[in-house]
Amino acid sequence: MSSDELVYMNWREIIMPEKVAVTTTSTYGKFVCEPLEKGYGITIGNSLRRIILSSLYGAAIVSVKFSEALHEYSVVSDVREDVSEIIMNLKEVKLKLDDPGDKILTINVKGEKFVTAADIISGDGRVEILNPEQHIATVSKGGELMMTMLVKTGKGYALAASNKDPEAPVGTIPIDSVFSPIKRVKYVVGASRIGQKTDYDKLTMEIWTDGSVTPEDSVAYAAKILKEQMNPFINFDEDIEPELVEKEHEGAAKNFNENLYRSVDELELSVRSSNCLKNAQILKIYQLVQKTDNEMLKTKNFGRKSLNEIKEVLTSMDLSLGMDLEGFEPPEEDQIKEGE
């Protein structure tokens, strides 16, 4: 083995995740990644979580100007809420922009009305209100509420002081802004199995967003950011690395579905099907999946109904009948029984 080959082993011999199982809606996502090397679950999970929470861009209202109020301690005639309460409500309005850049929003309400985010008017129509039901103010009969809001893009959380524009018109009130489109992120690290070894990591991440970005995209963007931040630490030319030649190493471990090691009792089959398997000495799922349809139908008292039942359950576990398990190693206790 050359010294170069020894260097390449540092990353070529690392266990890579087989896939990322994804369950998502427009605002919630669950991501299960396995198998990972021991310790990588925390390393990757914590890194992605911090980036998702701190580094993704979003849009928020950064200032507001009322027609008859000059500061946040003012009141607006015939409006139940004072200016500070209205500002608190504006901070809860969730926005999505079609393109970057500053946007102007307005509210022009006259007469008795329960004002919500649905009453916000976008001048160019390129701002989407994600929570139109958000309460803003309550205008009494004969009153009016007229105000102009400035929307900017940013990331994280910005205090009103940082949103203050010295060139803004008199009466413009800067407000605190929550730019992050992420509501919550959590991750859990569990155990994953490869063959007989169970000391690998399984990373499960859950993400809640405000709807301006999908959970899937938020993970993808965070992974891209992390990748770009790591690139400067690579001090060699990756393009000159030779192509990996696939070799069949004697005794090399293959990644097998962990359900293969479970008892057939865990399939929760009908009594008839369970008894047929026991009579045929099929006690573990790995023994079952190596049987073909025809072999199963030759089993005493085993019919087409039982066959379909078993095939349906196996499909839900990403398994099937007639599987080739070359290289599979049964649990030690099963090998001992077979040798007796």
Swiss-Prot record:
Segments for region (Alpha N-terminal domain (alpha-NTD)): 1-237
Catalytic activity: RNA(n) + a ribonucleoside 5'-triphosphate = RNA(n+1) + diphosphate
Keywords for the protein's UniProt record, in alphabetical order: DNA-directed RNA polymerase, Nucleotidyltransferase, Transcription, Transferase
UniProt-listed InterPro entries: DNA-dir_RNA_pol_insert, DNA-dir_RNA_pol_RpoA/D/Rpb3, DNA-dir_RpoA, RBP11-like, RNAP_asu_C, RNApol_insert_sf
Short name of any one Pfam family annotated for the protein: RNA_pol_A_CTD
Region span, Alpha C-terminal domain (alpha-CTD): 256-340
Organism superkingdom: Bacteria
GO molecular function, one term: DNA-directed RNA polymerase activity
SUPFAM superfamilies documented for this protein: C-terminal domain of RNA polymerase alpha subunit, Insert subdomain of RNA polymerase alpha subunit, RBP11-like subunits of RNA polymerase
Enzyme Commission number, as recorded: 2.7.7.6
GO CC annotation terms, alphabetical: cytoplasm; DNA-directed RNA polymerase complex
GO BP terms: DNA-templated transcription
Domains as described in the record: The N-terminal domain is essential for RNAP assembly and basal transcription, whereas the C-terminal domain is involved in interaction with transcriptional regulators and with upstream promoter elements.
Cited HAMAP family: RNApol_bact_RpoA
Entry's family note: Belongs to the RNA polymerase alpha chain family.
Function: DNA-dependent RNA polymerase catalyzes the transcription of DNA into RNA using the four ribonucleoside triphosphates as substrates.
Subunit structure: Homodimer. The RNAP catalytic core consists of 2 alpha, 1 beta, 1 beta' and 1 omega subunit. When a sigma factor is associated with the core the holoenzyme is formed, which can initiate transcription.
The protein's name: DNA-directed RNA polymerase subunit alpha
Origin species: Desulforapulum autotrophicum (strain ATCC 43914 / DSM 3382 / VKM B-1955 / HRM2)
Gene: rpoA
